[in-house]
């Protein structure tokens, strides 16, 4: 993995002073006239026609105000994209849907998997996937509030770093867990004889630990640098959407490209290979497994459709496009990132509720809960009537 080599860059240390050193506010004073003129010229400038051979910033490129480093100035075009109806209406609507649907769906699925289903290797993987989707629904409300309030973050710097890392951590953790599920199903269906020796709780536990630790390692750099800045000329405290140009150009470009490649493209490639071999094995049996073929194709399509667009836009954002495309690419990336979270609502229905046995267990469990609550309510009503009779007798 290339992340250990990138940590010095992400912490702000430079490997090549000529390329990565963060410029000071003013150049050193030289003895020549050119040096004297250069010493009075700020090196941190906001120029929409910036040379395309320089790395692009993460998010919208912001220019720190001369008298306040906590405030960023944005070009008018970037500010219009940042405050438009897509990030302030569409994105919070998507996040709200994820919370409303994903929280009960994944919570119920996790409950059934943990209490009513035999602890098989596939069950452990699906439980971890349900936990990841459930955690997303729990950490999304702050970002929902942020977008609904017109890009105003009220929870402080630490909460912004945690919320940003959690959002990206869910994305890449989910992709890694989905890749582990595809490997498990490949072993079970294509190598069914060997699977008895390979598929065990030990291998499953290792796969889950690798997925969680890899996701945490990939998003850890997001907690190293400041993420909240005040938008110049307004009361909007931005969270991760606009960052200083000079502080981001040296390390965020390799960091986020590595994040997209290792956290998304490589696991998705593994899923395509595993599910491709699984589909061939199922299709060889004709109509006998037609339902399994359709379901496997749906699982693969949903994962690719959910995670590919946002990560492709992320890579394009760092591939030195024309200066006019910087804001447009990030403006498209924000809703595509929100759309990727919809996968947490889809997972329960294509992995759990599609199974007739699973639905029966859910139905039986809900019926027992309803009967228990009805009997408890009836006993309380009977007790209250008895208390009323005793009270009237005493009177």
From Swiss-Prot:
Q: Where is the composition biased (Basic and acidic residues)?
A: 47-56
Q: How is it modified after translation?
A: A proteolytic cleavage generates a new N-terminus that functions as a tethered ligand.
Q: Name one GO molecular function term.
A: protease binding
Residue span of the signal peptide, if any?
A: 1-16
Pfam families the record matches = 7tm_1
- Residue stretch(es) of the prosequence: 17-58
GO BP annotation list:
G protein-coupled receptor signaling pathway; platelet activation; platelet aggregation; positive regulation of release of sequestered calcium ion into cytosol
The site (Cleavage) lies at 58-59
Q: Where is this region: Disordered?
A: 46-66
- Source domain of life: Eukaryota
Task: Give the sugar-modified residues.
Answer: 67
Q: Which residues lie on this side of the membrane: Extracellular?
A: 59-93, 141-161, 225-254, 317-330
Which residue ranges run through the membrane?
94-114, 120-140, 162-182, 204-224, 255-275, 296-316, 331-354
| Cysteine disulfide partners in this protein | 160-239
Where does the record place it?
A: Cell membrane
Q: Name one GO cellular component term.
A: plasma membrane
Bilayer topology annotation: Multi-pass membrane protein
PROSITE patterns in the record: G_PROTEIN_RECEP_F1_1, G_PROTEIN_RECEP_F1_2
- Which stretches are Cytoplasmic in the membrane topology? 115-119, 183-203, 276-295, 355-395
Please provide the record's keywords in A-Z order: Blood coagulation, Cell membrane, Disulfide bond, G-protein coupled receptor, Glycoprotein, Hemostasis, Membrane, Receptor, Signal, Transducer, Transmembrane, Transmembrane helix
Question: What function does the entry list?
Answer: Receptor for activated thrombin or trypsin coupled to G proteins that stimulate phosphoinositide hydrolysis. May play a role in platelets activation.
Name the family. Answer: Belongs to the G-protein coupled receptor 1 family.
The name this protein goes by in its record: Proteinase-activated receptor 4
